[in-house]
C-alpha cells in the first residue's frame, strides 16, 4: 500500500496544495468528476492525498451508500428518483437515464469550469452509461473535456467488454481527448504475491497520477510556462492521448527522466512519433544545469515528427533535490491503431508502481491493450455500478 508521505514525494500530496497558481491561470478552474464506483474511488483517493486549491473533486454515483462514504467536497446522487440510490445494476441505459435526470445538478456543479476531467471504469452500468452524458454537459458549459477511463479484465467476460467498447465509442464522439488506462498491464508491474487490495489500490494510484499530471501542468508557475491555452490547443486534436510521467536522479537526469517517460516494454508499438501536438513539463531545482535541460529538450525534438508542435514548460522548486528531475509528457492527436487498440498510456516512475519514491527507474508506459487484452474498471468490489 502507498503511504501518504510517498505520494507527497510524487507531488500528489499536501505539497501540491501549497503551490501558488500562475496569476495568468486564474479563472481556468479545473473540475475532476468521478463517475460510478470506480471513478468515485479515484476521487476518494485524490482527496485523501490532497489536491491543488484550483481543483474541485466531484463524486457522482447511482449507489447512495457508496457515495455517502466518499470524502469528496461535492457529491451528486445520480437518478435519485429513477434508481432510488440503489445503483444501476450493471445496466448502462439506467446509468444514462440517471445522469440525464440529474443533468441540472451536474451543470450547476461544473458551470464555472474551464477544464473538466471525467474518470470512470467502463463496463458497468453507471460509469458506462452516465459518463458520456456528463461529458456532453461539460462541453455544453464550454469546458475542455478529458476522459480518463479503464476497461474490464479479460476474464470478466465478453458482455462486459462489449459494454466497455460501446461506452468508449460514445465517449469518442464527445470528449476532446481520451486517456485509456490498461489495468491488466498495471497488474504486470505488480509483485507476484501482491494482494487484491494492493492491486485495486494501484489502479486508483495510476488514475490519480493521470489527473495530477494534467492539472499540474497549468496550476504551477514556472520560468517557462505552459498555460491553459497551450493545453487547449494541444487537446484540440480530438482523439486519443498518450501520457507519460518519468523521474530520474543523477547525471543527465533530465534526459533519463524523458526516456523513462517515453520508453517501456509495456509500450509495445506506441510512441510519440505519431502525435500531432506534444506538451513537455519539467520539474526540477532552480540550480539544475541549463545544458542538461537543453539536451533533454533536444532529445524529445529528435524523437518526435519534424512537423509536430512541441511546447515546453518548466517549474522549479527548492524542495526538489538538485540532481532530480520529474517530467510529464502529453502527446495528442494519435488515432486508434488497426487492431482496435489505442495509443493512450500513462507512465509511472518506478517498478512496480507501488513504490513511487524510487529515484531512478524505468518509466512504465501502460498502453490500452489489444481487443484480446481488455482490462479492469476499478471495480469488482462494488464498482460494478
UniProtKB/Swiss-Prot annotation:
Does this UniProt record's set of keywords contain Nucleotide-binding?
Answer: yes
What is one Gene Ontology biological process annotated in the Swiss-Prot or TrEMBL record? Answer: FtsZ-dependent cytokinesis
Residues given in the record as GTP binding sites: 37-41, 125-127, 156, 160, 204
A GO CC annotation given for this chain: cell division site
GO molecular function terms here?
GTP binding; GTPase activity
Q: Where in the cell is it found?
A: Cytoplasm
Chief subcellular location:
cytoplasm
Q: Which UniProt keywords apply?
A: Cell cycle, Cell division, Cytoplasm, GTP-binding, Nucleotide-binding, Septation
Pfam short name (any one): FtsZ_C
- Is this entry keyworded Isomerase? no
- Name the protein family: Belongs to the FtsZ family.
Assembly with partners or alone: Homodimer. Polymerizes to form a dynamic ring structure in a strictly GTP-dependent manner. Interacts directly with several other division proteins.
- What does the protein in this record do? Essential cell division protein that forms a contractile ring structure (Z ring) at the future cell division site. The regulation of the ring assembly controls the timing and the location of cell division. One of the functions of the FtsZ ring is to recruit other cell division proteins to the septum to produce a new cell wall between the dividing cells. Binds GTP and shows GTPase activity.
The record, for PANTHER family, names: CELL DIVISION PROTEIN FTSZ-RELATED, MITOCHONDRIAL DIVISION PROTEIN FSZA
Put simply, this protein is called Cell division protein FtsZ
Name its species: Helicobacter pylori (strain J99 / ATCC 700824)
Upper taxonomic classification of the species? Bacteria, Pseudomonadati, Campylobacterota, Epsilonproteobacteria, Campylobacterales
- Record gene name: ftsZ
Amino acid at each position: 500500500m502507498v503511504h501518504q508521505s510517498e505520494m507527497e514525494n510524487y507531488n500528489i500530496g499536501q505539497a501540491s496544495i501549497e503551490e501558488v497558481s500562475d496569476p495568468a491561470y486564474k479563472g481556468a478552474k479545473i473540475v475532476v468528476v468521478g463517475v460510478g464506483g470506480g471513478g468515485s474511488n479515484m476521487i476518494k483517493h485524490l482527496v485523501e492525498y490532497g489536491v491543488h486549491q484550483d481543483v474541485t473533486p466531484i463524486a457522482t454515483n447511482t449507489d447512495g451508500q457508496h457515495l455517502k462514504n466518499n470524502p469528496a467536497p461535492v457529491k451528486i446522487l445520480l437518478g435519485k428518483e429513477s434508481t432510488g440510490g440503489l445503483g444501476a445494476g450493471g445496466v448502462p441505459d439506467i446509468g444514462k437515464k440517471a445522469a440525464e435526470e440529474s443533468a441540472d445538478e451536474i451543470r450547476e456543479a461544473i458551470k464555472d469550469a474551464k477544464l473538466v476531467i471525467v474518470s470512470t471504469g467502463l463496463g458497468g452500468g453507471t460509469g458506462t452509461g452516465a459518463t458520456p452524458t456528463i461529458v456532453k454537459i461539460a462541453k455544453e458549459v464550454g469546458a475542455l473535456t478529458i476522459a480518463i477511463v479503464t476497461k474490464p479484465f479479460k476474464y470478466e467476460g465478453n458482455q462486459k467488454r462489449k459494454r466497455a467498447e460501446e461506452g468508449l465509442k460514445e465517449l469518442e464522439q464527445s470528449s476532446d481527448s481520451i486517456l485509456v488506462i490498461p489495468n491488466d498491464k498495471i497488474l504486470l508491474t505488480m509483485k507476484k504475491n501482491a494482494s487484491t487490495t494492493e492491486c485495486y489500490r494501484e489502479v486508483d494510484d495510476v488514475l490519480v497520477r493521470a489527473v495530477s499530471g494534467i492539472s499540474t501542468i497549468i496550476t504551477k508557475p514556472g520560468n517557462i510556462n505552459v498555460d491553459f491555452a497551450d493545453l487547449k490547443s494541444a487537446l484540440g486534436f480530438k482523439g486519443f492521448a498518450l501520457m507519460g510521467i518519468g523521474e530520474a536522479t543523477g547525471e543527465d537526469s533530465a534526459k533519463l527522466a524523458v526516456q523513462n517517460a517515453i520508453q517501456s516494454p509495456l509500450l509495445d508499438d506506441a510512441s510519440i512519433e505519431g502525435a500531432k501536438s506534444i506538451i513537455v513539463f519539467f520539474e526540477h531545482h532552480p540550480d539544475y544545469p541549463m545544458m542538461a535541460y537543453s539536451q533533454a529538450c533536444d532529445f524529445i525534438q529528435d524523437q518526435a515528427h519534424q512537423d509536430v508542435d512541441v511546447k515546453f514548460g518548466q517549474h522549479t522548486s527548492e524542495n526538489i533535490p538538485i540532481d532530480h528531475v520529474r517530467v510529464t509528457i502529453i502527446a495528442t492527436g494519435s488515432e486508434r491503431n488497426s487492431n482496435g487498440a489505442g495509443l493512450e498510456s500513462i507512465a509511472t516512475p518506478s517498478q512496480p508502481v507501488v513504490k513511487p519514491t524510487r529515484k531512478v527507474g524505468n518509466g512504465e508506459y501502460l498502453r490500452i491493450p489489444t481487443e484480446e487484452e481488455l482490462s479492469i474498471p476499478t471495480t469488482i468490489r462494488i464498482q460494478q455500478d
